[in-house]
Amino acid sequence: MQKRITDNINDLIKVLPPTIGAALTQANRTDELLEVILDLGRVPTARYLDGEVTLTNSEITHDDLKLVVERIGDFDADNRAGIERTLHRISGIKNRRGHVVGLTCRVGRAVYGTTDIIKDLIESGKSILLLGKPGIGKTTILREAARILAEKKRVIVVDTSNEIGGDGDVAHPAVGRARRMQVAQPSLQHEVMIEAVENHNPEVIVIDEIGRELEAAAAR
């Protein structure tokens, strides 16, 4: 049986404007919550497993977005930010002047027992590539695979956007004994991959996202 552990949803609610946080709490559906969408000039919405609903009838203002940004800190080069020691992710949409005009606040969850479907592949010792559309659980499976493999092997996680190990300098407990290397510039992730091999003697490397030719070459 799967055991779902949700990173304290209150940590995410606390960075949102009060009226939006209150609407989420009142809806009492946080177990099903996937994302909160905040776009300038539009009403805020919540995306659940069965669809999208409006949270309030008030349109999002610059002040609303500024409030959230101030509470989460700076965005990385890929316009993503997080909440320390959680798996939640906030992605920004910016205008041509670099000002935030939209936010996608994704709920991060650690789910134990998700690797059963590929357990034989994980234990084979061969390289594995997971493909699929966004939001179907690729990172969740990678996180759990890293935890399981780290019980017996030296595992390094190259964490493209801090989604496997969470935001902050201390990795989330869901990765177990696996060590985590953060990627300061996504365009240079291949260098972090090579550094992991050369400096830290891993038996297994887990990479969250591979989307560039240099990264594919480094993975070989």
Segments the model singles out, each with a brief description of its role:
Residues M1-T86:
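N-terminal accessory targeting/assembly segments
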Residues V36, I90, D159:
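Residue-level signature of catalytic and energy-coupling elements of molecular machines
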Residues G41, K133-G135, T160-E163, Q185-L188, ...:
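Short, ordered loop/turn segments at secondary-structure junctions
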Residues T56, V68-I128, G168:
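P-loop NTP-binding catalytic core
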Residues R89, I117, I141, L188-E195, ...:
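Well-ordered alpha-helical segments embedded in enzymatic catalytic cores
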Residues V107, I118-E163:
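P-loop NTPase nucleotide-binding module
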Residues L149-E198:
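P-loop NTPase switch/communication element
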Residues N201-P202, V206-R220:
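Conserved P-loop NTPase nucleotide-binding/switch module
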